[in-house]
């Protein structure tokens, strides 16, 4: 174990089929994109339904360090008004703390291009292992200077903005194979460049393309003009004044719905999540289709004007054979938990980039599946999970690696495997501040 055996959380066993409605907080991906775009405007923007979690609080802290005001409504802390600096330039000679938040460490450096002095970036010790170089290479191509205070291409570092930004259209080439956030981080700020941006991804594959599409849609919604050629892996952005509408409502986090909706397949019964959008740019929007392939019954009833995603299972799970999860790798841990109980093996592929997430998620998933008696192995680009007899599975103290999705993965296994205890379940605060209460509440309904 690499974490102290303190604050163990006994994952509750599902004593009966579920019948629960679970309200999921706002999307982290959308929340942090909207916060960046609001900071790039010239007028205040009120964000309604903003996720309040460690990652979004870190983002607001980073923006406030740069001189952006983030005023939390006294009546509800999920309503936040963002006011850009009056000068139109963010502050330099400041320190930005990223924690372990990929969206903070990869989106906020772009804002430093427009600062009036150098900006220092640091984070949790575990964040020093997360790759950063592609987005920083991109900023260097735009004229910024990056000084590393540790390993090149990783936190901590200082960004000094250029004396002048490129007047003509900037040409930037990076290899974003390790994370779609490198592309998104540059696209979010590109409209503010005097000549716009032509961005090329030089890698063979583009990870999590839906997240990039989300960024493009959000930039467009703030007044940007983006031409995406996904087959050529290029994005061309025109210079535009950016301004989100005065009020923006954040969709629920559909990836965070995965443990709850997936619970219906593991424990049997029905779980409903309200406010499910008809259309969405979130990769989690693919989740209902994936669960259906695994044997769930999925429907989208509208009750009192609210659209729900309703998932019903009977405790049986269909394995998926070779299953390409390139489009939605962030829900791989939740799907892996379900597939531990499947009737045949599954090769989840297209998710090699998960090795660079909060932890090496592929290695972590293999370790923890084996820890409870399951069968799994890493593949070059993914993960293989094979069925084992039910009596082979057993309780264990499960590691979370300071990774919120590994904590929810362990909780899902605990629905069906007795005596699972989870180390540091509080790591779920990264995106679900009250995960333990929500999980217990689902089982009590």
Give the residues covered by each predicted segment:
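Short, structured segments at the rim of ligand-binding sites
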Residues: 1-445
């Amino acid at each position: 174990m690499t974490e102290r055996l303190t604050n163990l959380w006994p994952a509750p066993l599902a004593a009966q089929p579920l019948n629960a409605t679970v309200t999921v907080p706002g999307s982290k991906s959308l929340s942090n994109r909207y916060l960046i775009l609001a900071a790039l405007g010239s007028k205040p923007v009120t964000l309604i339904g903003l996720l309040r979690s460690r990652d979004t609080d870190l983002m607001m802290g980073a923006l406030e360090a740069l001189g952006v005001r983030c005023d939390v409504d006294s009546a509800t802390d999920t309503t936040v008004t963002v006011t850009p600096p009056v000068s139109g330039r963010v502050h330099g000679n400041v320190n930005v703390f990223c924690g372990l938040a990929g969206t903070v460490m990869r989106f906020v450096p772009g804002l430093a291009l427009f600062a009036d002095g150098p900006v220092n970036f640091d984070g949790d010790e575990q964040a020093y292992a997360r790759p950063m170089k592609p987005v920083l290479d991109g900023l260097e191509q735009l004229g910024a200077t990056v000084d590393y205070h540790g390993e090149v291409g990783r936190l901590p570092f200082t960004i000094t903005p250029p004396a002048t930004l490129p007047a003509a259209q900037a040409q930037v080439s990076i290899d974003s194979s390790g994370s779609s956030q490198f592309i998104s981080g540059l696209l979010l700020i590109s409209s503010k460049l005097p000549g716009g941006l032509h961005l090329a991804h030089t890698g063979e594959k583009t990870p999590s393309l839906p997240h990039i599409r989300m960024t493009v849609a959000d930039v467009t919604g703030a007044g940007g003009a983006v031409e995406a050629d996904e087959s050529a892996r290029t994005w061309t952005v025109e210079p535009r004044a950016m301004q989100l509408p005065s009020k923006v409502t954040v969709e629920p986090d559909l990836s965070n719905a995965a443990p709850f909706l997936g619970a219906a397949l593991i424990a049997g019964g029905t779980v409903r999540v309200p406010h499910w959008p008809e259309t969405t740019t979130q990769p989690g929007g693919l989740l209902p289709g994936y669960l259906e392939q695994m044997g769930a019954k999925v429907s989208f009833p509208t009750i009192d004007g609210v659209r729900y995603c309703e998932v019903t299972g009977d405790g049986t799970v269909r394995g998926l054979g070779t299953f390409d999860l390139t489009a939605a790798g962030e829900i791989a841990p939740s799907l892996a938990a379900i597939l531990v109980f499947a009737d045949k093996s599954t090769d989840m592929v297209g998710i090699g980039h998960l090795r660079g997430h909060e932890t090496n998620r592929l290695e972590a998933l293999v370790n923890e599946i084996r820890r409870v008696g399951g069968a799994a192995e890493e593949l070059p680009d993914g993960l293989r999970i094979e069925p084992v007899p039910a009596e082979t599975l057993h309780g264990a103290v499960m590691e979370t690696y300071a990774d919120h999705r590994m904590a929810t993965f362990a909780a899902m296994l605990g629905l069906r495997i007795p005596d699972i205890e989870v180390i540091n379940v509080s790591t779920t605060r990264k995106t679900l501040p009250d995960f333990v209460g929500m999980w217990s509440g689902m089982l009590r309904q």
